[in-house]
């Protein structure tokens, strides 16, 4: 739907690219167009039976953004471990794009949707505090009109800090595929290594059990998000035995 970078500067484009983007925008600003397109995509995915919608902010890395028109991303040797998630949201470079994401959340909420926000790549406690403050600055203070903000466990540090991070957030979403990659330092897109990424390995199960235990202690929700569950009987057993756990499968 969108071919250009969310922080695009039209003056930096070639005449050909500028003409392409201008045609796409139809008189709107780049940010206005992004909001309208992404709102349409999100609203089309929301079904009448969805009482509550968890919406995750962008977890895209610089490698993916670098494929877009008007990008001005700094080249990173390892984008997956680079500027993404909270470190991107709080940066001056990404402020226009973060504003777009916040506008979308506010528009959805003002339209009557019960939106609960999920923050990806919360690496540290300071990340947690920073993003809550940043959301408040954008008119999305946690707790106002029952607005809930969750954080995503994408790497082991967020699991190790889960009890403290829960002071800042209303719940946890465990991105199991991402957590597995960062736990074992395996790129699942690498054909030579992908077979070694076992999501029911004992190390990962220990991390999952910690998140479940800590959320139960404070009576806050835990959602496990993963691409597929069928190949993992150990995880199936763990999830069945776990109190109050919810599972989201994207297969």
Task: Describe each model-derived feature in a short phrase.
Residues 1-251:
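Non-catalytic helical/linker scaffolds that mediate oligomerization, partner binding
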């Amino acid at each position: 739907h969108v071919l250009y970078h969310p922080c695009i500067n039209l003056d930096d484009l070639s005449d050909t690219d500028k003409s392409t983007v201008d045609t796409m925008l139809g008189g709107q600003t780049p940010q206005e167009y992004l909001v309208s397109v992404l709102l349409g995509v999100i609203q089309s995915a929301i079904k009448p039976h969805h009482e509550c919608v968890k919406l995750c902010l962008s977890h895209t890395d610089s490698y993916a953004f670098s494929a877009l028109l008007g990008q001005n991303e700094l080249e990173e040797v390892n984008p997956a471990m680079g500027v993404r998630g909270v470190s991107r949201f709080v940066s001056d470079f990404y402020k226009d794009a973060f504003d777009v994401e916040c506008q979308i959340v506010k528009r959805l909420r003002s339209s009557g949707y019960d939106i609960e926000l999920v923050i990806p790549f919360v690496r540290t406690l300071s990340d947690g505090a920073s993003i809550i403050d940043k959301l408040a600055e954008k008119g999305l203070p946690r707790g106002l009109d029952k607005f809930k903000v969750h954080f995503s466990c994408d790497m082991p540090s967020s699991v190790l800090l889960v009890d403290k991070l829960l002071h800042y957030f209303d719940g946890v979403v465990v991105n199991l595929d991402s957590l597995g990659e960062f736990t074992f330092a395996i790129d699942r897109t690498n054909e030579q290594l992908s077979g070694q990424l076992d999501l029911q390995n004992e190390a990962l199960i220990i991390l999952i059990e910690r998140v479940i235990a800590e959320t139960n202690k404070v009576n806050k929700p835990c959602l496990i998000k993963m691409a597929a569950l069928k190949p993992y009987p150990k995880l199936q057993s763990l999830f069945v035995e776990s109190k109050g756990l919810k599972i989201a499968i994207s297969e």
